[in-house]
Each structure stands twice: as structure tokens, then as C-alpha cells.
Amino acid sequence: MSLTALIQFRRFRIFSLYPQRERLFVRKIIVLLLAACGFGSSVLAQGLAGDWIGEMNGSFKVRIHFERVSSGFKGVLINPSGNETVLDQITSDGTHLHFAVDKLNLSYDGVWSEEESAWKGSLKFQQNYPLVLKRATAEEMAPAAHKRPQEDAINAGPAPYAQREVRFNNFAGHNQLSGTLSLPNGEGPFPGVVLVSGTGHNTRDEDVWGHKVFLVLADALNRKGFAVLRYDKRGVGGSSGDYDAATTADFASDAEAAVAWLRTQTQIDASRVGVLGHSEGGIIAPAVAAADKSVAFVVMIAGPCIRGDKLFVLQSAMTAKAYGAPDGYIASRKVFDQELYSAILSAPSELDALDRARELVAKGVAGKIVDANEAETLPKDVSRPWERYFLAYDPAPTLARLTVPVLALNGSLDVQVPAKENLAAAREALKKNSKATVMELAGMNHLLQEAKTGAPNEYNDIEETMSPTALKIITDWLSENVLRRGHEPTS
């Protein structure tokens, strides 16, 4: 993955898509990652124009293009998709090179090495770290083409199920939701699954990092004999409503409306309708089941099971560690996050929360824990309704109320909803539910992909959208616990 791709990374938060301030926070983490791994760039002034490439840890690649202009040089970083980030302050006297990315408080200084035909220098961010760049071929500069074999197979068809566009109302939320209902071949009635996506402006397919997670998941469920309803989140795609004003409780209200609508369909067995949620959806699924006793089952994929503020602190530290940030920064940021979230939780109003956040962020900037770009948006983001609600929400009491079959899955490499802490909380909350299954899937990340580190920058580069092993565990569990009568899949 290129430097620009990393800089443009927007943290999943705990789920699928990401508030603006997560992007700014992760930019700082990414810079630390690049520094720790020796990332930089340089070029001989006489031949500076053209393409250059560097590699970090054998996998992360940075591509740079320089052009000569009347005032000197201009340059960009190019990510695998071809998106560019402008470099600042590019200067070279023939043997030395300097450039900066001002908005990240990052700079590079290098010296030309005749022996290696490369720039050897240091990336500066709080301290200095080594880096080397060499000339790049056209092939090396080409945008990476990521294969999606599971999605390609689905699109190639034919499929043993039918799909149709649907709309349903959430009268409590005063909005209408648009989605896709997919039904296995046959007469039915079929057990039904409502898919609930994670945080962010997600469509019905949960399009994240170049993957269509719910497309692949729905296909697997349909082939096992389940009807599936997936929908665009409020304010996204074909759904109405105000996304930005919503909290997790509002998204849960939408999921409740989806369950109620699905039960009314003639080909659905209303007694066997359940909810499957990913990430934030993994909080919503048990909340819907606790509020509606007729929900037949719950599946939680990477669903948080500890209070929001504790999760965010843990997530921040583990994500930074996965990116290779220095231990000192991780420790300092943990203290800062704890103090910030405590202040937000104790604030009596959104305005008070904003004021307290501004004070703490100013201290964070002075202590070089928060950079200037993050400081612009962080106070507003952490004081908004969604964040304040989530910070205070503890999923465990809701889980403890469930008596229906529950499957809770986390990947061992998940850095956004870490398996150890969250599954321990799930086991404790569900200990009286004999129908609950809690599993940690070895070597899998937040999307249940087979991964190396679990860091979010791997998601796009991994070809599989969801591990076939994980899909089999989910569908086998549902077959055992739900699919006891009625239609059997034709293929």
C-alpha cells in the first residue's frame, strides 16, 4: 500500500465507515508508522523529474512523481487507485532533496547516493527515521488492480435465488428505507435474516475498502435457504432520513422497522426472522432482539461488547500498534483519550462537551499528541450526539437479557473490536444463555478476512471479501439453530 493510501486511510472506528476526525487521527498514526518503518523519499535534482518508488516492510509502497516547473519542482504521492496528494516545499541543489507535507507536519531530507542510484534520507516527525527511494518503472507506477473472486463469482451467476428492490417505512424515525430482498428458489416460507451494517454511510452491500461485504454474506445465506433483507442506511443511497443527526439508537430503530417489514412478507416464516449485525451492527442486533421478543436469533460479527469509551481507547491503542507507532506515543495517546472521553461523558450538554474537548485538545497539541489538522475537527466530532451516545453505551446488559440463540464472532487479529476483551465480555454477559456460542476465529481481522496484521490498511489488498471458513461457520450455525424445517437449498 502506498504512502498516500495510508495517509488517506479513514479509520473504521469500530465498524465499517468512518467519521472525519478518525481520518485525521489515523493520519497522525500513519505518519508515525511510516516513520517507525523508515519511510521517505528523495531524488537527484538533475534527474528529479519522473517517477520514484520506495518500499516499507516488504509490502507498503510509496510512489512519487516529480515534474520540473518554472519555479523548481512540483510533486505528488500516488496511491494504488491513482489518487494524488500534493507535496510541499520541494527543493534540491543536485545532491540534497527536501520536501514536506505541511498538513501532516511531515518533512523529508535526503542525500543522493551514486552507489545505490537512490535518495537516502530521513523522514522527520518528532524524530528522524531512515528512507530510500529509487526510480520506478511504468509497471510499478500503475494503479494496483485488486481482484475480488467471491464478488466476481456472484456477479457471473446464475444464482439459486431471486432478488428484488424493496422499500419500507420506519414510522418511528419518519424515514423510508430502500433495500434488496433476496429469496431462495422454491415456495417457502423461508427463515429470514436482516443484515445491519456498521458505522458510516453504508449502502445495502456494506461497501468498504473495495469490498461488498453484505453482497457476499447474503449470497452465502441465500444458498443455505435463508431469505435476506439488506438495506441502505438512513440518508444513504435510496433511503431517506438524516444520517448525521442519528445515533446508534436511531439506527437500531431502522433495523426494528426492517424486521417488522420482513415478517409481513408472504414467503417469510415470521417465527424464524433474526438479525445479523457487523461492527456497530453487532451492537444493534442484540438491542433489536431485546426490544422485540419475537426475534428468533442474533448473529454478531465483530460486535462490541464493552462500553464505548473503553472500546475507543483500546481500539486507538491497538490500531496504532498495528501500524507500528512508537510505544511512547501510544502510551501518551491512551492517557489523552481517557481524559477526553471522561470529560465528554461528564459534560451536561453538547455545548459543554465541545468546550471541554477544545480545552483538552489544545493541551494535546501543545504536548504533540494531537496535530493541528486533527485539532480542527476533533472537539466537534467527539461532542456530537452519535459519539456521546456511543461512549456511554454498554452492550453487556442488553446481551444478558437475550434468551434466543446468539452467535458472537471476532477475528483474533481484529484491532477495531479486539477479540480478547470483547469476547470475554460477551461470554460473561451470555453465561446464562445455553443457546449462545462465542468464538474467536484465528488469523482473521475486523471483516473476518484471513489477514497478516489485522491493520485496516490490509483490507483493500486482501482479495477475499470474507473468509470462506467464516462464512461456513456462520451458515452452519444458522442451519443448526434456525433451519430446522421448511425449504432446503437447491444448490
Specify the residue positions occupied by each region the protein language model found.
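Short substrate-entry loop that stabilizes the transition state in hydrolases
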Residues: 188-190, 199-223, 308, 415-416
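Central antiparallel beta-sheet cores of small beta-barrel/beta-sandwich binding domains
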Residues: 46-114, 118-127, 160, 166
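Conserved alpha/beta-hydrolase
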Residues: 216-238
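Alpha/beta-hydrolase active-site loop
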Residues: 245-266
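Accessory cap/linker subdomain of secreted extracellular hydrolases
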Residues: 299-401
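Short beta-strand/loop motif that positions the catalytic acidic residue
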Residues: 402, 408-410
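Short alpha-helix in the alpha/beta-hydrolase fold that links the catalytic acid
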Residues: 404, 418-429
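N-terminal cap/lid segment of alpha/beta-hydrolase-fold proteins
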Residues: 142-188
